């Protein structure tokens, strides 16, 4: 009985302290009924928080469409120059890269560790883990263009090419949907190429445990062997805390396997700390098989996850990392 009375007393003290604080603030600011305002603000927060969590991911899509509108304006402004210049889109790429790099810095404090592993010239195949929304790769492409002056081609899922309005964006930033022969041709021409073997399936079905969802895919490894290029593994810390997908549920798994379209809803858009880590390049080896190279690459990406990612991921911890400085050793950070 005594314990209950003590607990009740503690509750009363807490309420009295809050009431007292509100009265002090009312007297200080000369505002009446401050407690009612406070309760109303709490009610609004309770009502709108779920809505905000669902809207934030679509802000990224909004930014993509703003980029597309800018590219259309740029194209029409330079319609006469197009016939005379092979570098028509360089100015647009530079502008868009600067805008996305600014967004990365402000919203995520974005960093790239190991940029020196990207060659100044010549080909390389970049293999990366696919987040629910691969916004980290947009930021990474912007960094490469700004600091290396290079455009990184990327293999995108076929459904992306069917999104209304995206065709110009994909053309300007050199996205392709394969096939393998085209990938080999791009690399043999001396370009950078990025592939996420997990693709949309990994985006939907992986989660805060950061499990790699590649299945038996090894086509990317055969591309690297045929083109005789190194593979650079890549992983972005906290990418699953920025955006979360509900695609791992049975219904959305079935819908994806049936229609090959990502119907699963997403939530997030949280301003978590994002750090992209580039692993040591896996050099070309004429004696290795595609199966062995695929497994070796998967192990390299997994090693980056094990080293740099808290498992399971935690949104609050990822947010707090914005205010912590990690010591950077023996790696160039951008």
UniProtKB/Swiss-Prot annotation:
It holds the Pfam family Acyltransferase. One of its GO terms (biological process) is triglyceride biosynthetic process. GO terms for molecular function: phospholipid:diacylglycerol acyltransferase activity. The keyword Lipid metabolism applies. Acyltransferase activity is specifically inhibited by TMX1 at the endoplasmic reticulum, restricting accumulation of triacylglycerol. GO terms for cellular component: endoplasmic reticulum membrane; membrane. It is a multi-pass membrane protein. It is found in: Endoplasmic reticulum membrane. The chain crosses the membrane at residues 51-71, 126-146. It is an enzyme of class 2 (transferase). Residues 72-125 are cytoplasmic. The active site is at residue 130. Belongs to the diacylglycerol acyltransferase family. Highly divergent. Catalytic subunit of the alternative triglyceride biosynthesis pathway, which mediates formation of triacylglycerol from diacylglycerol and membrane phospholipids. Synthesizes triacylglycerol at the expense of membrane phospholipids, such as phosphatidylcholine (PC) and its ether-linked form (ePC), thereby altering the composition of membranes. The alternative triglyceride biosynthesis pathway is probably required to provide the energy required for rapid growth when fuel sources are limiting. It maintains mitochondrial function during periods of extracellular lipid starvation. This is DGAT1/2-independent enzyme synthesizing storage lipids. It comes from Bos taurus. The lineage of its organism: Eukaryota, Metazoa, Chordata, Craniata, Vertebrata.
């Amino acid at each position: 009985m005594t314990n209950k009375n003590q607990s009740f007393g503690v509750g009363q003290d807490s309420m009295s302290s809050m009431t007292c604080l509100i009265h002090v603030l009312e007297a200080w600011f000369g505002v009446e009924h401050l407690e009612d305002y406070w309760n109303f603000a709490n009610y609004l927060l309770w009502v709108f928080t779920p809505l905000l969590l669902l809207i934030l991911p679509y802000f990224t899509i909004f930014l993509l469409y703003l980029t597309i509108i800018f590219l259309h304006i740029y194209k029409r402004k330079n319609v006469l120059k197009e016939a005379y210049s092979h570098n028509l889109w360089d100015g647009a790429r530079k502008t868009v890269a600067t805008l996305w790099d600014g967004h990365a810095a402000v919203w995520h404090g974005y960093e790239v560790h190991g940029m020196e592993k990207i060659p100044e010239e010549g080909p390389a195949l970049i293999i990366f883990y696919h987040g629910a929304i691969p916004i980290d790769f947009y930021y990474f492409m912007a960094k490469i263009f700004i600091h290396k002056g290079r455009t990184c081609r990327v293999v995108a899922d076929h459904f992306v090419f069917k999104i209304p309005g995206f065709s110009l964006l994909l053309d300007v930033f050199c996205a392709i949907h394969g096939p393998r022969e085209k990938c080999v041709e791009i690399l043999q021409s001396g370009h950078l190429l990025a592939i996420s073997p997990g693709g949309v399936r990994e985006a939907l079905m992986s989660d805060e445990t950061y499990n790699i969802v590649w299945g038996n895919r090894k086509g990317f490894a055969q591309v690297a062997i045929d083109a005789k290029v190194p593979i650079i593994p890549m992983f972005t810390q906290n990418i699953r805390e920025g955006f979360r997908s509900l695609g791992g549920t049975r219904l959305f798994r079935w819908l994806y396997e049936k229609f090959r379209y990502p119907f699963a809803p997403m939530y997030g858009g949280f301003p978590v700390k994002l750090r992209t880590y580039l692993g040591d390049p896996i050099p070309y080896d004429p004696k290795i098989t595609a199966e062995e190279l695929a497994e070796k690459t998967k192990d390299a990406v997994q090693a980056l996850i094990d080293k740099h990612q808290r498992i399971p991921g935690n949104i609050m911890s990822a947010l707090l990392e914005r205010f912590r400085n990690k010591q950077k050793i023996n790696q160039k950070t951008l």
